[in-house]
Amino acid sequence: MLLATFKLCAGSSYRHVRNMKGLRHQAALAIGQELNWRAPGGPTQSGWINQVRRQSSLLGSQLEDTLYSDQELAYIQQGEEAMQKALGILRNQEGWKEENQQANGDKVLSKVVPDVGKVFRLEVEVDQPMERLYEELVERMEAMGEWNPNVKEIKVLQKIGKDTVITHELAAESAGNLVGPRDFVSVRCAKRRGSTCVLAGMATQFEEMPEQKGVIRAEHGPTCMVLHPLAGSPSKTKLTWLLSIDLKGWLPKTIINQVLSQTQVDFANHLRKRLESSPAPEARC
C-alpha cells in the first residue's frame, strides 16, 4: 500500500519522477499518514524475509523535514525497488543449484531468474554480532578496498537521507586476468526491520561519474545482503548475499560462473579476517 501510495503521488519511474514538480510535498504527506497508520512489529526467525519485504517502504525510516529533490526521490525509489525485487528472489526457494560448497559450511547457490538472468546466493555464518557486520559493510563501506582484494576502491558519490547512497566501485582484475577492469555505479539502501538488516542496490545513472577510459562499465542487477542473528546464538550472524551482475564484454558463461561464485567465497573469507583483526566499534544497525 505504501509503495503504491508513493508511486501514485511521485511517479513510478525515473522518467516520470522528473516531471513531478509540486508533488513532493503531497507524496511526503501521504507517506507520512501511511507510516503513522502502520503498527511496528519485529520479524519472527522463520519469516524474516516476508516481514522485511512487507514492512520495507520507500521512506520506511522516520520521515525527515527536508524534502528531497526530484532526482533524489528517483534514486530513493530505485533503491527501494531493488530491495523489493532482490528479497522476492531470495524468498523463492525453488530452482537453486549448488555452485560451491566449503568445508566450513559456506556455500554458493545459483538459479536463472526471468528478466534478471543468472543470480548467485552466498550463505554463511559469521562469528560476530550483526551490528559489527553492519558497521563494516555500511558505515565503513569506503574502506572495503583495504581488506577485499577484489575491490580496488569504493567511493560514496552522494548520500541521500539516512538510508540511500550513490556509489562508484572499481573492481580489481580477476586472477589470471580472466576478467579485465570493471567499474560500477550503483544506488544502495540500507534498512533495518526488527532484528534483520537488509543492504540492497542496483545499477543507476549518475551524470557526475561517466564511463572511464580503459574500464568497462558493468552493472549490478537487483542485489542484496541480508543480516540477522543466528537462531540460538545472538552473538553470531547469518549472512545471505544475493549477487546479480552483468559484467558486459564478451565473456564465456563458464568463466563468469567461476569468477562470480569464487568472488563470493573469497568475500566471506576476507570479511572474517577483517572482523577478527580490527577492533569492534560501538555501532548500531
Swiss-Prot record:
Record domain START: where: 67-280
Subcellular localization(s) per the UniProt record: Mitochondrion
Modified residues (Phosphoserine): S57, S195
Entry-linked InterPro entries: StAR, StAR-like, START-like_dom_sf, START_lipid-bd_dom
Record GO cellular component, one term: mitochondrion
Reaction(s) the record says it catalyses: cholesterol(in) = cholesterol(out)
CDD domains recorded: START_STARD1-like (cd08905)
Transit peptide extent on chain: 1-63
One annotated GO molecular function: cholesterol binding
Keywords: Lipid transport, Lipid-binding, Mitochondrion, Phosphoprotein, Steroidogenesis, Transit peptide, Transport
Any single GO BP term: regulation of steroid biosynthetic process
Listed Gene3D superfamilies: 3.30.530.20
Pathway: Steroid metabolism; cholesterol metabolism
SMART domains referenced in this protein's UniProt entry, alphabetically: START (SM00234)
Function: Plays a key role in steroid hormone synthesis by enhancing the metabolism of cholesterol into pregnenolone. Mediates the transfer of cholesterol from the outer mitochondrial membrane to the inner mitochondrial membrane where it is cleaved to pregnenolone.
Quaternary structure annotation from Swiss-Prot or TrEMBL: May interact with TSPO.
Protein name from the UniProt record: Steroidogenic acute regulatory protein, mitochondrial
Species of provenance: Equus caballus (Horse)
